[in-house]
Amino acid sequence: MADHSASGAPALSTNIESGKFDEKAAEAAAYQPKPKVEDDEDEDIDALIEDLESHDGHDAEEEEEEATPGGGRVVPEDMLQTDTRVGLTSEEVVQRRRKYGLNQMKEEKENHFLKFLGFFVGPIQFVMEGAAVLAAGLEDWVDFGVICGLLLLNAVVGFVQEFQAGSIVDELKKTLALKAVVLRDGTLKEIEAPEVVPGDILQVEEGTIIPADGRIVTDDAFLQVDQSALTGESLAVDKHKGDQVFASSAVKRGEAFVVITATGDNTFVGRAAALVNAASGGSGHFTEVLNGIGTILLILVIFTLLIVWVSSFYRSNPIVQILEFTLAITIIGVPVGLPAVVTTTMAVGAAYLAKKKAIVQKLSAIESLAGVEILCSDKTGTLTKNKLSLHDPYTVAGVDPEDLMLTACLAASRKKKGIDAIDKAFLKSLKYYPRAKSVLSKYKVLQFHPFDPVSKKVVAVVESPQGERITCVKGAPLFVLKTVEEDHPIPEEVDQAYKNKVAEFATRGFRSLGVARKRGEGSWEILGIMPCMDPPRHDTYKTVCEAKTLGLSIKMLTGDAVGIARETSRQLGLGTNIYNAERLGLGGGGDMPGSEVYDFVEAADGFAEVFPQHKYNVVEILQQRGYLVAMTGDGVNDAPSLKKADTGIAVEGSSDAARSAADIVFLAPGLGAIIDALKTSRQIFHRMYAYVVYRIALSIHLEIFLGLWIAILNRSLNIELVVFIAIFADVATLAIAYDNAPYSQTPVKWNLPKLWGMSVLLGVVLAVGTWITVTTMYAQGENGGIVQNFGNMDEVLFLQISLTENWLIFITRANGPFWSSIPSWQLSGAIFLVDILATCFTIWGWFEHSDTSIVAVVRIWIFSFGIFCIMGGVYYILQDSVGFDNLMHGKSPKGNQKQRSLEDFVVSLQRVSTQHEKSQ
């Protein structure tokens, strides 16, 4: 605790005029236990900052900034045709916008008609269009009309659903639009980035994405700008007055004013055509999956047709009959509704996520989020509240806590716009240090250098009321200690006590801030440590437990010290295997073999004292081990990791750079929002997966049955009934996008070998059931079989096929037995209506002009339910079968040693490369 002995560093001036200060009251207030500051307590911080600004000249400086950028940092007249005292006027802005247009890349407006026509393009659609041509050639205008209607129905439904869902997402995306702060009409204004025009004076600071090309005009400017998206440079580039900055680059450090020299297509990015729209609705891997499925089904159709043609030519069937057989196989062989249903499911899911404050930047992000196995999460704001509160300080012998607090507050921002959470916490706690609070405004800030992520310090140069020049430092304790040690030796007992206190605070979960000062040209003085805590969010522990049940591993990556990270991780139930990121040894040192580095990262619960490169390395290593990785971030430095991750997640309050790099942007705080979105994405993926299995099984079912029936018995279903089977299969399941699908308790991804294996098995079971139905109608018993006594063979088969196929979706949509999950009313209602319609077809003999007895209909319903139960049993047994999965994949344990050797080589190469870069 604080040592109040008289010896030690002389205190700063905290003198107050006689009679103006109640010392007893102050002592009672100063040394009573400091309670944590409540989350919603903002007390008179803004008023206090305004008071500080007015005393040290910052207020005047900001007013001057509104007139002349940077308080005297005037833009040269020969560089700009802009009034340097007021920026552009409203009239000039209008004129320049009329001349140069909006600051955005010219994009061809999406032609809705062409987009609609796109729903008629693809392997599956081409087959159906070929079937329509074939029907027209046979002059079967009924089938021609029905096939065209089916194609049109799928296109209309897909287009309308995607358009409506896209509109919802676009509306919310508007809240993510990049902003720009410009000087106009004498004031600094925040505007939308597209509204920037040439000649605008733009204010940029850490975290800003520069919206247009420009030239720095601030006299003493020092910016570090990330241009990696343009030039591939991995390190930030230093920029000074007169240097050019480019659109889409991100400011990593510093602040300055920039005059805009080019906008829109005239920027470097525009000319190079290198800007990729991160918010495109790319469909990603699932489009490749669908095209692959369509191609394979097309091959199966061709194979089945070869069998049909050979058998037909062998029997010398008429060409018209052969064409009718061809038309039937073509219609049932490819699921025309597959692309529309899957795209609709994704679009509706994106709209649903948007309503839950998760903005999907591209549809493929839903698919990748559903498969995420490891979440690399930052600590502050995601796992914790990002609301710091101070606790009792540790002071070096002879240092007054009031003096420590005053020095720490002097090394704090005095601008409302630039104040960070740490500075805000210090100013809030000033009420417990009345003497420091009363004199703080008497000190004038001459220079202020915000937190530097490399030196891990904040530095301020101030002038005391007596005119003394004082340098105040606040930052990471060991870095502050190093600053003092570089100036002069520190007594061993002071040094050891200081380090012990840092370790003690860390084990208790506190984040420590060291405080030091230098008077004039004197020596540096170490004052002490101020502990603060960013407590875990109230829901984080529960959410972490839920994440574990969902098969999601969370690794915490934080810049805090190991002790703090380990204690926070313990409180949250994440585990205590937290290590210093330097142990990875990827910065040029380290002797751990590459494969052991990979094992180390895989086994760790998180890493502390991380830099941006460490985050990138961790994500890359986990990906190379075969994991799908999500990464959360909010700052400029997180952008490379967000891009590298399979799913980049920008958390609430993220910088423009992080939002641009992310796949999903969250507008709600905390880990709970991410886990909620993950569950929703798994539901969406499950709907797609269930429908794909269902639809492939249906195609295989009828290809097997009709192919064999034609080849063996030279018979086929009435072509009109075949068309309606295809219609019913698609119409009944269009509502799958709105189903109450269960979400998997484990990460999900496209398991194509297993998907095909399961679909083929279900298709075979369906085909066997239909074949049994046919054989009973050929039976020669006492009653002569169903067909002679009860109705028409084609109508009975039509009903049996329709019922068993429609009910299959109830099996594939469930994770367990089909009764374990209740389907939505939309899906149940659609299937029920189709079943009733199919029954009416059969009873009244539509297209066959032959009635079917109600007895036969009841028998078919009962028989179909039996087939449904068998399919349900097969699916339930095999869906979680490791043996079946391995059989489909042909997995082998060989090759692991080869992988580890490759990992050793990659890490060795990376270390050599890093050492070479450092030696340059």
Swiss-Prot record:
It comes from the Eukaryota. One of its GO terms (molecular function) is ATP hydrolysis activity. Pfam families: Cation_ATPase_N, E1-E2_ATPase, Hydrolase. It catalyses: ATP + H2O + H(+)(in) = ADP + phosphate + 2 H(+)(out). It is found in: Cell membrane. It is an enzyme of class 7 (translocase). One of its GO terms (cellular component) is plasma membrane. Residues 139-140, 315-321, 714-720, 780-806, 848-853 are extracellular. This is Plasma membrane ATPase. It comes from Neurospora crassa (strain ATCC 24698 / 74-OR23-1A / CBS 708.71 / DSM 1257 / FGSC 987). The gene is pma-1.
